[in-house]
């Protein structure tokens, strides 16, 4: 059996786990939480019928999943050269030739096309926001800023914060102050989250010549930046006062807990990675708790 035939067989047998890696399903799932919360809050706060809104919510979630997965697949296509250098990326199907470039591009553009159709079927603003997210993530982040500036994480935070806007607009048809507040939560959250991850992988990024802030400016500078974003995030819950004082207080306590963790002192440089890991884990829990809390509190207003 020829080497080419064996490779062809491998490519045709990409399993579900590998497909999840290609479309970065973990990242997609994380972004679906604020997308759903945006749609749910639009239903509750603008007095839409929940039952009649279910088809819209499901179509929004499907469309969002497809455009995010497609954009991530395209990111994997473009990043193959640096992924081959970074040890943590060696199991990606794009690195070990489990999928051809042609099939990867077909998957990517196919998902994004169908996803955009879903969003435009909802309304034009949802489709436009989806396009903005795709263009921002693929071009401004993946192709340009990721490889050229330490501001890459902040630049990537703009398209990364689009999901709650799509969720809200899918129901209401236009952006409101509440939708902007949800956008700001995700926008401010991302630098803290990804800087923590970058601290853990700073040597890998340096090896691949990717100008992540910890690799270029060092730990202290990155920690200061994370603290600045924590301070910016602190008053954002006040914009969601429509959810009630209880929500604002709980969300603020959640922010203060993160700030307290960020101010943790340590004696050894080896503790930097441990601190970054703790900040990273808190960030994962933060996003879930914040938006689940918003949904629960909004439910209480219906009682």
Curated annotation (Swiss-Prot):
Protein name, as recorded: Protoheme IX farnesyltransferase
Catalytic activity from the UniProt record: heme b + (2E,6E)-farnesyl diphosphate + H2O = Fe(II)-heme o + diphosphate
Something else known: Carbon 2 of the heme B porphyrin ring is defined according to the Fischer nomenclature.
A UniProt-annotated Pfam family: UbiA
Membrane topology reported for the UniProt record: Multi-pass membrane protein
The keyword Transmembrane is assigned to this record: yes
Source lineage: Bacteria, Bacillati, Bacillota, Bacilli, Bacillales
Family assignment from sequence similarity: Belongs to the UbiA prenyltransferase family. Protoheme IX farnesyltransferase subfamily.
One example of a Gene Ontology biological process annotation: heme O biosynthetic process
């Amino acid at each position: 059996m020829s080497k080419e035939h064996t490779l062809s067989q491998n490519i045709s047998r990409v399993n579900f786990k590998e497909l999840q890696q290609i479309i970065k399903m973990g990242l997609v799932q994380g972004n679906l939480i604020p997308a759903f919360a945006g749609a749910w809050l639009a239903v509750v706060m603008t007095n839409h019928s929940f039952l009649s809104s279910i088809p819209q919510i499901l179509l929004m979630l499907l469309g969002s999943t497809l455009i995010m997965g497609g954009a991530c697949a395209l990111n994997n296509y473009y990043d193959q050269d640096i992924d081959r250098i970074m040890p943590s990326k060696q199991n990606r199907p794009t690195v070990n030739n489990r999928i051809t470039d042609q099939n990867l591009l077909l998957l990517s553009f196919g998902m994004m096309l169908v996803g955009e159709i879903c969003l435009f079927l909802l309304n034009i603003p949802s489709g436009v926001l989806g396009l903005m997210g795709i263009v921002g993530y693929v071009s401004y982040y993946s192709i340009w800023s990721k490889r050229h500036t330490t501001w890459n994480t902040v630049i990537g935070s703009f398209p990364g914060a689009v999901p709650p806007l799509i969720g809200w607009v899918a129901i209401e048809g236009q952006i409101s102050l509440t939708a902007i507040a949800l956008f700001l939560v995700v926008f401010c959250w991302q630098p803290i989250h990804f800087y923590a991850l970058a601290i853990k992988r700073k040597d890998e990024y340096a090896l691949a010549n990717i100008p992540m802030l910890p690799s270029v400016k060092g730990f202290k500078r990155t920690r200061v930046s994370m603290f600045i974003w924590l301070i910016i995030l602190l008053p954002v819950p006040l914009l969601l006062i429509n959810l009630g004082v209880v929500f604002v207080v709980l969300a603020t306590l959640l922010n203060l807990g993160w700030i307290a963790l960020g101010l943790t002192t340590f004696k050894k440089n080896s503790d930097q990675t441990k601190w970054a890991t703790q900040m990273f884990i808190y960030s994962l829990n933060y996003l879930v708790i914040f938006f689940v809390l918003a949904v629960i509190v909004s439910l209480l207003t219906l009682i």
